[in-house]
Amino acid sequence: MALDYAKEQIRVMAICPGAFNTPLLRNSMAGDIEEGFKAMGDAHPIGRIGQPDEIGNAASFLCSDKASFITGEYLVIDGGMMALSLIHI
């Protein structure tokens, strides 16, 4: 898609989020939510789950002129989980 629209100066990117503190995640958890978030965070290399504003900050950057040469990219925002999985390949 990025190649299809590049000549029109339309940039195409995707944000691929990991575990984030959202109502969807909260509603899917049983038991103590904060305890669950801590356990999930401990599994992440960065030591916590993400906050919604971190996705917003990335989206704002990608939509800005500062990212004007970026197209056809996937931005993984997952606290290092993908990097962790690559260690085991």
Task: Describe each PLM feature range.
Residues L3-K7, F20, G50, C63:
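A short hydrophobic alpha-helix cap/turn motif
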Residues K7, A19-A43, L84-I87:
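A glycine/serine/threonine-rich, flexible loop-to-helix segment
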Residues H44-I55, K66:
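A conserved structural motif in NAD(P)-dependent oxidoreductases
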Residues S60, T71-I87:
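Short C-terminal tail/terminal secondary-structure segment
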Residues A6, R11, I70-G72:
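Short, small/polar-rich loop/turn modules that mediate ligand/substrate recognition or access, typified
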Residues R11-P17, N21, C63, V76-D78:
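Conserved SDR Rossmann-fold cofactor-binding beta-strand/turn motif
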